[in-house]
Amino acid sequence: IIEHFGGMNMDLFGVPWAMNRFDELISLAKRDNIYLGLTAVSCMLADKKTGYDIAWEAVKRAASVIGYSKLIWGSDIPGTLRIYSYDELIEWIEKAPFISEAEKDLIFWKNGMAFFGENE
């Protein structure tokens, strides 16, 4: 699991090298055993003033290449809890108008179950 989309930041769509790095990261996630973690993406690619647009665009870009079955939710303890509560960390995925309920189920629990070899 490559957490935090590999450490992307707010410059993702404004800096060419950052986009190249992100595209390389997405390519890595095409491999069977590699997933991209979303837990702190809202902290890194969004803020309470500007909203979730950059974070959402990053998820759309990744999902268009690897699908929602390669995006996973993690715990991210304890770092991000200094900035956001768990409710706020989950909110940016819950409010994403382009992610279906079935895709949210993949992100929040089904992909984790598959990764760790658990059955439903």
Set out the residue ranges of the language-model regions.
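Short Gly/Pro-enriched loop/turn and capping motifs at secondary-structure junctions
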Residues: 42-43, 77-80
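Catalytic pocket-lining loop regions of alpha/beta-barrel enzymes
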Residues: 1-72
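Divalent metal-coordination and catalytic microenvironments
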Residues: 4, 36, 76, 104, ...
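Mid-to-C-terminal alpha-helical segments outside catalytic/metal-binding sites
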Residues: 61, 65-72, 81-120
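Bulky hydrophobic/aromatic packing residues
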Residues: 33-35, 77, 89
